[in-house]
Amino acid sequence: MQLPFYVEALASNPKLLMKQHGQHATLSLHAVHIQCSGFMDILDSILKNTDQTIGQAMQLGDRELQQLWKWNASVPQTLDDCIHDIFVEKARRDPSRQAVVSWDGELSYGEVDQFSTLLAIHLIKLGVKFGNHVLLCFEKSMWTVVAVLAVMKSGGTLVLTDPSQPEARLQTIATEVGANLMLTSERQEELGKRILAGGVIVVNHDFFQQIQTSVLPPASTTDLPSVPGSSPLYTIFTSGSTGKPKGVVISHANYTSGALPRAEAVGYGPHSRVLDFPSYAFDVSIDCMLCTLAHGGCVCVPSEDDRVNNLSGAIRNMKVNMAHMTPSVARVLGEDTLSSLEVLGLGGESVSVRDAANWGKLTKVIIAYGPSECTVGCTINNEIALDRAYTSIGKGVGGVTWVVDPTDHSRLMPIGAIGELIIEGPIVGRGYLNDPERTSSVFIEDPMWLLSGCQGYPGRHGRFYKTGDLVKYDPDSSGSIVFVGRGDQQVKLRGQRVELGEVEHHLRTRLPAGNVVAAEVITPGGKGDQPTLVAFIAEKTTTKSQTNKEIATFSTELRHSLEVMDKALGSVLPRYMVPSAYIPLLEMPLLVSCKVDRKKLRSLGSAMSRKELIRHKTFSSQKEPQSERERQLAHLWKCLFGAEAEIDVQSNFFDLGGDSLMAMKLVAAARAENLLTSVADIFRHPTLAELAITLKHSDSEAEIDVPPFSLLDSHWKENNARIETAKLCGIDATSVMDVYPCTTLQEGLMALSAKVSEAYVAQRVVELADFQTAQRLQRAFETAAADSPILRTRIVQVPGRGLMQVVLKDGITWRAGTTLEEYLVKDRNESMGLGTPLARFAITSNETTGKVHFVLTIHHALYDGWSMPLVVRRVNRAFNNQESERSVAFNSFIKHLSGLNHKDSEIYWKEQLQGANGLQFPALPRAGYQTQAQSLLEQYFPLGKTSASSTSIATSIRAAWALVAGKYTLSDDVVFGETLTGRNAPVVGIEKIEGPMITTVPVRVRFDRNARVSEYLRRIHDDSILRIPHEHMGLQHIRRLSPDAREACELRTGIVIHPTTTEDGKNLTGDGPANGFVPAGDEDAAREALKFNTYALMLVCSLDPKGFLVMASFDSATIDVCQMDKVLGQFGQTVQQLCENGNALVSDLLPMTDDELAEIWRFSNTYKPNSGNEVVLGHDYSHATATWIVAPEDSEQLVPLGGIGELVIEGDFPTNTSIQISGTKWLSAGHRDIPGRQATLHKTGQLAKYNSDGSLVILGGKGGNIKSDMEIKKPEAKSRSQVTTPKQQKLRKLWARVLGISEDEVGSNDSFFDLGGDSISAMKLVSEGRMENLELVVMQVFQHRRFHDMADIAKESLPLQVSTKQYSPFSTLDVSDVDTFISESIRPSLLNSSWKVVDVLPARPLQEIAVDGTINLPRYSARYELFYLDAAVDQSHLLKSCQELISRNEILRTIFVKSGGSCFGVVIEELQLPLDEYQIDGDLTAFAEQLCGLDIQTVMSLGSPFIKFFVVQSSSGLSCLIMRISHAQYDEICLPILLRQLSALYEGELVPAGLPFSSFVHHIVRNNIPQSIEYWRRLLQGSSMSVLRPSTPLISKKSIFISKTFDISSRSKEITLATLPTAAWALCLARRLSLRDVTFGEVVSGRNIDFANCDTVVGPTWQYIPVRVKFKSGWTVIDLLNFVQHQHISSTPFEGIGLKEIVRKCTDWPETTEWFDSVVHQDVEHVESLRFLSANSRMDTIYPHLEPLREWKIQAFPKGDSLCIEIVTFESWRAEADSILNEMGDIISLLVTKPNSTLFQTDVMEESTPPTS
C-alpha cells in the first residue's frame, strides 16, 4: 500500500532511528520536509519532557517558527499620503488626459480635478469637516468619480451606496452614520429625498454651472484643507449577524498603504482602461476609481443596462483592458472579450483551477482576496500556477498574513495546517462604526507570539484583524495562502458577502415563535447548478412528507406567515439575501455540540432539483382564488377571456391570450369595480395572485375634472391667457373656455402641416338619405361638440410659451356646397394651421342629382384611431336622441403628462439609445434624400399557438422585424419606430378620453444569435414594459438628448400593430349615420394608418385570431417592389418560427422562405460538370464556378436576397489564396430539383448582397465600412473649340492630366475651375507645367482661368537645367560655429551619439507644435497608417522597401531636439529601420488597432526617431503593415507622395521624386519670410483677432463634431470651392459679432509660393494664415466672393510664413497670441488603397489620441454638387454650434443662389444680430 506519508521507526539502543517517507506524486518536497520537521519537533519535545501538557508539546518548533517569521519579518510601511493628492498631481501634469469615459459623458483629468474641487469647496461651505459622513447615492455615472474625490478633498468620509438596494437598508445606513448631506444623481434625487429629508445635492453639469460663480475666482487646491492620513476616508457597510448592516471605517492611511502596492501588483498604469463594474455597495468599486486615477489610467463606466445586459459590448466599446469581477460574472463573457483584456482581476468567491487555467490562456489572470475590514484587497496572486489541483490567493499586500488556531488566536498553526487567517499591518481598518464591542472581538493587538518573536527575529507590537476565514499556507514554500472556507456563518453568494445570521434574524422576527430557522447556501442537484440561498424551517408541529423522511409539509398557518414574510423581506434585505426557497423539516439536524449541522443541511438541499425548490417557493396549497381581491380579479378575467377560461391564482394574463389592448380593457373594467391597476402593473405582474396584490381601491366619486386654465404656468394669468390666445385665433377673448399645453404628438403634427399643408388632414364623406337627415346629423354634431372639447379645440403658437391648445365656447362653423367634388377641391386647398379651426363641417346638396353629403375635414392633431370611434359614438347617440355619459376630458391626460418626471425619461432614453448609431433599413439612395412612399404590398400569415407563454404576438412581431432588418444591415443592434396607442398611462378613464394620444417611440432591439428564442422574446417583452412610463416624451425631444439619440431617431422603418377588435369593440360606435366617418373594420383601420406614412417603409400589422395581415407602404427608390415582397415573406416566416419554437436558438431560425432559397440556388448555381464554364470575378478568383453569400459569423447560413453577408466562391483555387470552407450542409443537401454536391468554398473577406434581379453588389471588406453601390456617371464629352498651337496642345494635356478628364473635354473657352479645378489642382498644374517647360504661377491660374487666356500668358522655357546654386547643409542655421553647435547643443540630445549628423534645420512653428504633440500626452500628432494586405507578400522585400523609403527621404531620418528654447530637426545620414514584428492567430484588424493603442502609450522622446514600422502576420496568411509617423514629418499633401513611393519601391517601378524638406525650409527662412512681411503688415494693419465667445460657461472641454451637407449645385464655377466656406464664415462672424471687419484663420498648403516643384516637397509645409475681410457698403454677394478669392490668390506667394512670425513682425497684436480663435479647414486628397504586386492593400488611418481643441474649427468637405460643413467646438457650446451651422447653411445658400444680392439689404447683414449664446 502506497501512503502519501509514513514514518519508519528502528530501535537501536540507546537510540531511536526514525525514517520519514513521502510520495512526491501527492506531496511537494517542501511539504514532505515540513511534515517531517514538525513530526520530529513534537517527538523531540515529548521525549525531553513527559510531564508537559499535550498543548505544550504541540507548540511550533524553532525551524517552523523561523520560517513563519521569515515570511512575515517586515510589516509594510504606513503610507500617510492621500490618494486624492496623488490624483491632483497627475491632473496638474497632464490635465487633458482622459480620466473617465462613461455612458453619460467623458471627463479629462483637468475636468475631474476642477469639478471635484468646486464641489469640495461647496461641501466645506455647507459645514463638512474631518470625519463627517457624506452619503453618495448614484447609478453608474461619471459624476460618481467626481463626487468621491470631492468628499475626499473636503476631508469628509465617503459612504457609497447602491440605489438598487432596499430603501429600508439605505435608510438604516443613513441613520447609522448620522449623515446630513447626500450627493446623488438626477435619477436618484427622489430616492435621496426620501432617505434624507434635507441636504440632497444633485451632481451634474447644471449644478456646476450654478456653483461656479459662488466658488470662483478661482477654485484651487489652496482653498482645500490638508487631510491627515489618520482621517477616515470611507465607511463601507457589510452584512451583519444582528440583522443590521455593520459599517467598517477605513482611514486614508489604511487605504493608501494597501492601494499603492496592490495597484503595482495588479498592473495599474497610464495605459489602464479599467471597467467600473462592481456595485458601489462594495469596496472594490473604490479601487476601480482611485487606483486607476492615481496611476494615470482611465475609468470606464458602463450604463446600468449595459452592465447587466451588454457587458461584453461595454468592454468592447470602451476599449477596456482591465476588469475586476467575480468568476460567476467572468463566465458569461466570451473568449473574444476575455482575450481583449490585459488583466482580469477575480475576487469575491473561490476561483476554480479549471477557470484559472482556461482564462489564463486568454489574458493575465489575477486572484485577489480581502475583507472590507482590511481595505479592498490584502492578498494578491499575480503569478497563477496552472499545474496544480488548487489555486492560491497569493501573498499579503500592504500587510502580512498569519494563520492561527480558529478557537485560540494566541496559538500559531503549523505550516500546512488549516487555521484562521489574521491580517497585520497598516491596512487593518479602524473598526466598526459605533460598535466598540464587535470591534474589540475581531480587531486584536499584541498576541504573545508576536511580542516574543523567535531566534533571529525580534518581537514587535501589532494590530490584527481576525478574518474568520479558514486557510493554510501553500505547500510550495512561497508563503502564499490557500483559501479553504469560512469559519462562521458568513458566506459569499455570486460575489456578494452574505451574513447568514442577518438573514436568520429577519426570518425569526417575522415568523411565529418556536420555529427553528437556518439559512444556508446550497447547490441544487449537486455541482451542476448555481449556488442558491435557501431557508430551512422546522415547525413545532409538522406533518411528515410522504416521500422523504426528513422533509416535512408546512402547516396552513405557517404557509400564510411565510407568504407575508417573503414579500416583506424584499423591503429590508438586498435581493440576493432573500431566500429562493423555504424548505420544511421534521426537525433541525444538530451536531453533538447542539449547533446546527450545516453540512447536513447542505446535503439535503443539494439532493433537491431546481424544480423541487421552485415548489418550495409556492406557498398556497390551493389553486382557486382565495382573497376577495383574487376573486374580483378572476371575475374580471372571465369577463375578458370568456366564462369557459380556467383561471386559478397562478394563471398568467398573457397565457390566456391577453395583450396590451386587453390590458387596457382590464384596467377600465377594474375601475368600473372601483379597483385601480395599470397596464404597466399587468405587464410586471402577469399572474392573478401577483396582480391581485397590486390592486388598490378607488373612490368612484373622486373628482376627475381638471379646472379650466389650471394647467398654465403660474406666471401666466387666466385673463392674459384668454386675451393672447384669442388674438392669435382672431376671436373675442370671452370665447376662450380653456388653454393648456399641447402633447409632443400634436407639436410634431402641426410642424409637419406647416411644411406640407395637406399633411395629416383627413376628409371624411358620408352620403345621407336627404337634407333633413343631414340637418339632424348637424344638430347631433353640435350636441356632441358641447360635451367633447376636442371638437372645439384650436392650436396656437404663443410667443415665449410654445404651442398651446385653445378650447372655444362655440367651436363649429358650418359650410355649404352645391356639388361634392367642387367643395372637396376647395376644402383641400384651404390650409389648416395655427389659430384656425382644426375641424370643418359641411353639407353639400346637389340639386341636379339630389344627393346630399356630409363632409368632415379634421386634423390629426384632434383625433387618433382610438378616439374617433368615441366621438362617432357620441354623435350617433345624439342623432338617436340618446344620452351620452360624460367623458374624461383631454386635459386630464395633459395634466398627467405635465406631472411626469421628465428627467427620468431623459435618462432612460439617453441610456437606451447610447451607441444606437448603426445602419438603418432600408438604405437611402443618397445623402439628404427625402423619402416618399408610393408603393404598397400586403401578405397574410397564419399563426399557431405561441409556445413563448408570456409574450404577445406584438412581441414576436418586434423581434422578427429586428432579425430581418439585421440581415440587411449586417447588425445585431436594430432601431425602428413603433406607433403606440399611448393609452398605457395611469389616467382614470383613459380609455374613454376623446383626443389624440398615439405616440411614436424608437424601439431598439439587440439580439444574441446564441440566445434561446424564449429568452430573446422575454427581453423584448420586458423592454416594452420599461418603456411605458417614457413613451410620451416625443421623438423631437428624444433626438435632442445626445448624438446617438439623434441618429437613432432618424427612423427609416415604422411599425404599427393593430390588435384584433373584439365583438364589443366592433359595436362601440352604435348605430347611426356618423359610422361612415370611421373605418369599417380592422383592415380598413390599418389601411387608414398607411395614409400618414412619413417613413421610407411603414409596416402595419393587423392581427386576427388566426394570424396577421401585414401591409407595407414604402418608397420603391429605397427598396424595389420585388425585393420588398421577399422581405415581407422573410418577416412573416420569422414571426411564425418565433411563435412555434420557443426552445430553439435564435441562430436556428431560417432567414428566408423556401421559394427564396430556390431563387438563390438559381442565381448562384452556375456549376455545370465538365462544361468548362467559368465565372470571372477578378484577379484572385478566375476559376470560380459559383458564388454564394453567407452570414459572416456562420458559413452554414445562407443570407436572404438583399441581405448583407460575406461573398464565398465555389471552385478550385490554390490553397494559399483564401480561407477555405468545406462540408457545408446546405451545399451538400441541394434544393428541390438541384442535387447537392461536395465542393470547396473560398471566403473572400468581401461583404456583398444580391439585387432582386440576381446581380451581385460588392460592398467592401469585412473590416471596413459598407460602401454605396451607386454609380457616379461621368459627364459626356462635348464639342470643343479648336486647340491648335503646340503650346495650347501642351497645356490641354496638362489640364486633362491634372483634372482627371480626357483632352476632348477641354475647350479653348473653358474655365479651369468649371472643369473641377481648385487651389490644390492649380498648384499641381503649375508644378507639372514646369516639368513640361511651361512657366505659370498659381496666381496666374486664378487670374487667367479660361483656357485661351492661360495659354496666352503661359511662357515656354528651355528644358530644366541642373541649378548651379545648390542648397548647403547647415546654411539655415544662424550660428557662427556649426561644429561647436552640433557637438555641444545637438549631439548630447541624440539617443544614439554615433549617428552621423548631415544637416540641422530650425523647426517651423507648426512643426514645433507637432513635436510637442508627439512627445507629450495626449500624442495627437502621432498617426498610424495601416496597410491590410489581402494576399501574402514577400515580407523581407517589403521591409527592404521600407528601409529604402527612409533612406530616400531626409524628413524620415529627421530627429527632433530642443536647445536654448528652440526646436531643431537633425537629419542623420542613416537610420536603421525601426521595426517590431508580430505573429498572431486571432483577428488581424482587432490586433492591429490594439497595437496602435498600446504603442501610443510608449514614450516618444526628443532625440529619438518618431518614424516606426510594425509587421503583423496572421496565421490566415493575411498581414498588416503599420507605419507610425509624426505630423512634424508630414502634411496631407506629402503623405500620399511617401505612400506611392513605398508602393513603387516594392513594385520595382519608377519612384516618384520628391524635393527634400531642407531646401524648402532654407527658401522660406532666407527668401519667403523677408518677402512676406510687407504684404502681411499691409493686410493686417489696424486689425484685431475676431473672437467668438458664447456666454455659456465652458464646463466641458470635450470636443463635439456636428455637420450638415448643403446643396451648392448652383455655384458659379468661377468661384472656387475653397472660397465658398471662407466667405461664408467671414459673413457669419460679421453677423454674430456685429462687425464690418473680421479676421480669422485658414489652413493653407504652404506650397503656392514661388519655389520650383514645391508640390513635391516631402515634409510638412502647411500653415495657418490670417484671412481679413473688411466689408464695404454696397457690396453684393459676388463682391464678397471675389474679394475673398482675390485675397486667396494674392496671399499665395506669402503663405510660407508662420502665425508666430506674422504676429511678431507684421501686427500690433499681443505677442502672446499663439492661435486663431476660429479656423477654416479644407479637405485634401486621401489615399485609400495601394498595390504591392499581387496584394491589394486596403488602408486605414488611426489617430489614437485626439487633438486638444484650441479654436472653433470650420471644416469643409466638398462632395460633387454638395458641400459638407463640419463644426468642431466644445461640448458646452453645442447650442451655439447648432445655431451657427444652420446659419452657415443659410449663408451658403445665399452665396450660391443670389450672387447679385446686395449684402446690406439682405437678411445677412442688416437683420438683428443673433446673440452669441
From Swiss-Prot:
Segments for region (Condensation 1): 738-1159
GO cellular component, one term: cytoplasm
Any one Gene Ontology BP term: secondary metabolite biosynthetic process
Ranges where the record places region Condensation 2: 1427-1806
Region (Adenylation): 89-494
Domain Carrier: 624-699, 1282-1358
EC number(s) reported in the record: 6.3.2.-
O-(pantetheine 4'-phosphoryl)serine: modified positions: 660, 1319
Enzyme kind, highest EC tier: ligase
Functional description taken from the UniProt entry: Nonribosomal peptide synthetase; part of the gene cluster that mediates the biosynthesis of hydroxamate-containing siderophores that play a critical role in virulence via intracellular iron acquisition during macrophage infection.
Family of the protein in this entry: Belongs to the NRP synthetase family.
Descriptive protein name: Nonribosomal peptide synthetase 1
